[in-house]
C-alpha cells in the first residue's frame, strides 16, 4: 500500500467532513495547483508563514473556488515560495441546491461589506450591486473598481470561513435599468416590498417548492421608487412582502436568504 492509499484509508467516508479535521483552511487559485503540488506565493505565503506560523509537515485544508477541496501537507516554506504536497482531493457537496442571485441596492456606509459577507455564508450564488433612484452613496469608476476588489475579497474570505467550495462573484455596480436588462436563467424573479398588499411569502413558498433558480431584488434605505417597481414588474419580477414590520436594507436580504435555504434549500 502506497502513501496515498494509507492516507485515504484513514479518511472519513462522509465527503462533507473529509478535510474538516485540518485546523486551517485557505484558498489557493487553481493555477497554483497541479496534480500533486500546491504552490504558495505573495500574501498567502506570508499569511501561512508569519500569521498562522505553520511549519513543514503541518497539514492544511485547501479549496480552489471551483468546487474542489484538498488536504495538503507543507513540504517547504521560504520567504519566496511555499510548496505543499496534495494528500487527497474531493468534491464535497456543500453548495446549496438553489442558484440564488441577489440584486442589492447600494446602502449607506459600509453596510454592503456586511451584506456580502453574510449572504455568502448563507449560500448566495452571485451578487449584483446596483444604484437606484433613492440610493444615497454614489462614486466614480475608479472608486467602484476598488470597491469591487474589496467585495470580492470579502466573498472569498466568507467562503473560506464558512466551508464553501465555490466563491460567489460580486459583479460591477450598475444602474437599476441595466440590472433589469441583464440576461437571467432564473425561474423565479422577485422584488421584495414592504407593502403587504403584494404577494405573501408563505404563498410564494407553497407554490414554488420545485424551483431552483431565484433572482431577488432588495431596495435601498428609502425603498424602491414606484416607477422602479413598475419597471421590475415589466421585466417579469413578482412583488413579495416579508410582512408588516419595516426591515433595514441589510436585514432584508439575509432574512429572505435564510428562509429560502430553510424551506427550499439545504438548511435543515
Where would I find each of the regions flagged by the language model?
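RNA substrate-binding interface of SAM-dependent RNA methyltransferases
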Residues: 2, 87, 93-190
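Active-site/ligand-binding-proximal alpha/beta "capping" segment
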Residues: 186-223, 227-229, 237-240
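Fold-independent oxyanion-binding glycine-rich loops
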Residues: 30-31, 42-43, 65, 106, ...
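Structured adenosyl-cofactor binding patch, chiefly the S-adenosyl-L-methionine
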Residues: 226-268
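Glycine/charged-rich beta-loop-alpha catalytic/anionic-binding loops adjacent to active sites
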Residues: 38-40, 97-101, 212-215, 233-242
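N-terminal positively charged helical leader segments and presequences
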Residues: 1-91
Amino acid at each position: 500500500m502506497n502513501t496515498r492509499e494509507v492516507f485515504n484509508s484513514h479518511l472519513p467516508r462522509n465527503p462533507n467532513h473529509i478535510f474538516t479535521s485540518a485546523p486551517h483552511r485557505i484558498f489557493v487559485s487553481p493555477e497554483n495547483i497541479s496534480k500533486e503540488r500546491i504552490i504558495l506565493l505573495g500574501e498567502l505565503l506570508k499569511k501561512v508563514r508569519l500569521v498562522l506560523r505553520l511549519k513543514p509537515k503541518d497539514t492544511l485544508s485547501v479549496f480552489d473556488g471551483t468546487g474542489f477541496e484538498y488536504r495538503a501537507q507543507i513540504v517547504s516554506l521560504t520567504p519566496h515560495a511555499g510548496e505543499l504536497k496534495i494528500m487527497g482531493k474531493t468534491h464535497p457537496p456543500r453548495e446549496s441546491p438553489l442558484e440564488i442571485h441577489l440584486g442589492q441596492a447600494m446602502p449607506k456606509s459600509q453596510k454592503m461589506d456586511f451584506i456580502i459577507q453574510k449572504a455568502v455564508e448563507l449560500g448566495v450564488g452571485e451578487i449584483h450591486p446596483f444604484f437606484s433612484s433613492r440610493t444615497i452613496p454614489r462614486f466614480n469608476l475608479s472608486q467602484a473598481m476598488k470597491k469591487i476588489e474589496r467585495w470580492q475579497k470579502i466573498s472569498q474570505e466568507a467562503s473560506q470561513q464558512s466551508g464553501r467550495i465555490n466563491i460567489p462573484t460580486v459583479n460591477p455596480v450598475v444602474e437599476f435599468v441595466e440590472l433589469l436588462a441583464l440576461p437571467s436563467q432564473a425561474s423565479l424573479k422577485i422584488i421584495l416590498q414592504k407593502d403587504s398588499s403584494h404577494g405573501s411569502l408563505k404563498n410564494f413558498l407553497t407554490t414554488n417548492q420545485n424551483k431552483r433558480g431565484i433572482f431577488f431584488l432588495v431596495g435601498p434605505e428609502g425603498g424602491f421608487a414606484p416607477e422602479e417597481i413598475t419597471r421590475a414588474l415589466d421585466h417579469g419580477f413578482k412583488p413579495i412582502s416579508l410582512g408588516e414590520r419595516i426591515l433595514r436594507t441589510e436585514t432584508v436580504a439575509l432574512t429572505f436568504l435564510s428562509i429560502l435555504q430553510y424551506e427550499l434549500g439545504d438548511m435543515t
